[in-house]
C-alpha cells in the first residue's frame, strides 16, 4: 500500500528515538509477560477507576528539527541587553573547553548522584576540587559539595546556626539590611515555619538586639559596599552568637576570607565561576563552616577514604546527616544539589588557576575603579567609598539615565532610591565602560579610559587595606597544572572515564528514572537567548522565556490534572517544601493554622519526613500491610485520632514499593474527610503520564521531578527542577517573589528559591521532550516503562523473589528484588551484588530502599531489549555465582562477590583467589569493558578519618 504524505513526514519520529524497544521487541516482551498489548498490560495493572479514557491533550508530536525551530523562534523573543543589575548574578565567560567537554558531554551530565563511589571517582574528584576552592576562598575548615542557590544556602545557614547555638532560649535571627532582597525573602519564608523571629537592621546595630542566636552579614553588600566585619564578628562571638557571612567567589579572590575574621559559616553563589545567568539558574551555592560544626552542615560532603586495597579513594562522607537516613531528623531535606554546576565552577578554577583568577578579579576591579573615577570627576556621587565590582551612583534625573540605558540596550539596577546600581563582570570591556559613561553623563563627557586607568592604577583606595587578602589561594597542584587547553581536555577526560554514566550503560536505579536525555533536548540550554538573561531584567526582555514557561506550565497542568503550576522550586525536595507550605498557608487562611499533622507511610522516601519537618509539621507514620500497601485501617485510625490537627498526607504513586495501590482514591477520601489535604509525591510520575494523573486520582498538590519524568539530566547529582502542581484552592498559596512579580500567579507568599522561576534555563529540556513526544508518545513512554519493569521482574523472579506485586503478580514501573533470603542462606548481601554488577558493567540498582536488604530496579522506557537482557543475564550470572558460594566451591570470605569490584591492576598482581582473573574482571566478556578505578570503599574509615580537601597528586597515581 502506498504511504500517505503524513506517514512519510513521520512527525512522531522522535518517539521511536526516545523509547528503547521497537515494536517487534515490545511484542516479544509482551509475550514474555503474558500480555497481548501495551493497552492490555496497562489495563491489568492500573486500577480501573483511575485510568484516563484518553491521554491529556498536549498536542501532536513534532520532529526534533521542527521542535528546535519552534523553540528557537520563541527564544528569539528574548532581548539580550547587557545587564549590570548584579544582585548576585553576572555575565560570565564559560571556557569553551569546559562547555564542550563537560556541559555538552553526556559522560558528565547523565551520571547519577555518587552514592556508588566506585563508579564515581571522576566527578567526586571534581567536587573535592570545588570544596578546596571553597575552603581556600572562605578561610574555613569544612565545605560541602554545593547547595541549590545562594538564598537557599542562607536559609540553611540560619537553620544550622540554631542547631549549633548554645543559646538555646534565643529565638531571633538577625539579617543585615544590605543582603540581597531575594536572600532575605527566602530566609523569611524558612524562618516562619521554624518559628524564628527575623530582625532586619543595619549591621552596626546588631548588638542592640537581645535573644539573637545567629546573624547573617554580607561581605559585599547588595549595593556594593565592602564591609570589614572583623571587629563586629569578634564582639558577636564573645556573646556566643553564630555568625554567617554571605560572600562572592570572585570578590574573595582579592578580599580577606571571612573565616579568617572569625565567621562560623560562609556561603554564596559560585555562578560567576563560569556558569551562565540563565534567567536565574541553575547555579551552585558554596557553603563552608568551622570544623566543630561539621556534623550539623547541610548537603553532600565529599571525603577522602581508602578502598579495600588501601588506595586513596573518594566518597560522600557523613551520610548519616542526610534525609535518606535520618528522615525528619535530618539536617536538611536536600537530595538533589547542583553537582554539574559545582563541577563547572571547580574546573573553571582549575583552568584559570590562582594567577588567572587574580587577573580576572583585578581586571573587574580596575574597570570598576575607572568607572568610579570618571563619574566622580564629572560630579556624580557614589554612595560607598569601598567597593569591588559594584557602584551605587546617585543621579539627579534617574528617569533620563534609565531611558538612555534602555536606548543603549543596557540594564542598570533601578530599585535603589535616587540612585542606580552598576555591577561589572569578567565580560566587561573598556568599550563597555565608555558606553556607561555615555549613559550616565551624556555623550560629551570628554573622559579618556587610558588617562583614568593611569590615575587609578597609582592610587586605588576602593578596597580597604585591612580587607585585602594577604594569603595564597589555590596552592594545590591541581590548580596550577592544567592551563593549556590540551592539558585541560585530557584532565577532564581522565575524570570522565572513571565514571559510569548513561552514555555507557543502563543505570537501573529504582525511584530515580534514569532515562534518555536526548541531544535535541539539551541543545537549547546553551543558546545565548536563554543562557544570557538576568533573572531580574525587565519582563518585556524575557517574553520568550515567559512564552516557553507558560506553554510548559499549560502542558504540565493537563498532564497532572491540576489547575495551576508554580515553576519556582529548583529541586524535588524544594518542591515538596513549597507544596507543604501551600497547604499550611491554605489552612491558615481558614483560621486552621493549628493543623500541623502530616501523615506519611512507613515506605516513604526520606525527603518526605524531612520536608514536613522543615515546613513546621509533625510527622505521624502510617503503617503498610504485608503487601506493601498503605494500611487503610491504620490510616483511618490516625486520621480520626488527629482530625482536629490533620494537615495532610504525603503519598507516592505508584507507591515506593513499585505497585499501583488499588485503594489510592480511598486514601484521598479518608484524608479529605478529616479536613486534610493530599500531597502526592511526583517521584514516580513516569508511571502516570498519559495513563492517570494526580488530580484525577484526587490529590491536591504534587511536585514534579522534571529531572526524572521530563528528561532534565541528573548531572551527577543536580541540577533538578521540582515545580508544583496545585488545585485551584491552593493556587494563591504557592511561592511568590519579592523582586519579580510572577505573572499569572496571584500569590503573596514568600519565595523558596532565589530566582522567580528557579533554574529557568533547563526548562527548555522538558519543553522539548513534551513537544517531541506529544500526547500519544508520552502515554506510550509510560506504558513501555511499565513493560520493561515487568519484563525484568518476570525473568528474574525465579532467581530473586519480587517483594511486592499488584494484581496478577504485576509491578508498576519498577520492581523490588528481595535479597534477604539469599543473604540468610549464603551470607551474600545486596551490597555484594551491587558491587559485583560493576564488574559486569552496570551501575547498581537502588540498595535497601524502601526495604532493607533489597534491590529496587527501574529500567525506564529508554532502555532497549538488548540492554535489558544484558542486565538480566548479569543478574542471573551473579545468582549462579552465589550458588557457587552456597555449594562451597568458593568460600564466603573469598569469592568474586565479596571482593567486587575488581580493578585493572589486579590483572598483573599476585593472584591468590580461588577463582580466575577472567572470572573476576571479564564475567560478561571482554567487549567494551568498564574499568572501575578503585576497589570497594571503606566507609567506616572515611567517616572516622574525615578529610574533605584535595589530597596530594601522588595519591591519584
Swiss-Prot record:
Oxidoreductase in keyword set: yes
Catalytic activity, EC: 1.4.4.2
Catalyzed reaction equations: N(6)-[(R)-lipoyl]-L-lysyl-[glycine-cleavage complex H protein] + glycine + H(+) = N(6)-[(R)-S(8)-aminomethyldihydrolipoyl]-L-lysyl-[glycine-cleavage complex H protein] + CO2
SUPFAM superfamilies per UniProt: PLP-dependent transferases (SSF53383)
Modified residues (N6-(pyridoxal phosphate)lysine): 708
Keywords assigned: Oxidoreductase, Pyridoxal phosphate
Xref: HAMAP family: GcvP
Protein name: Glycine dehydrogenase (decarboxylating)
Species, as recorded: Salmonella typhi
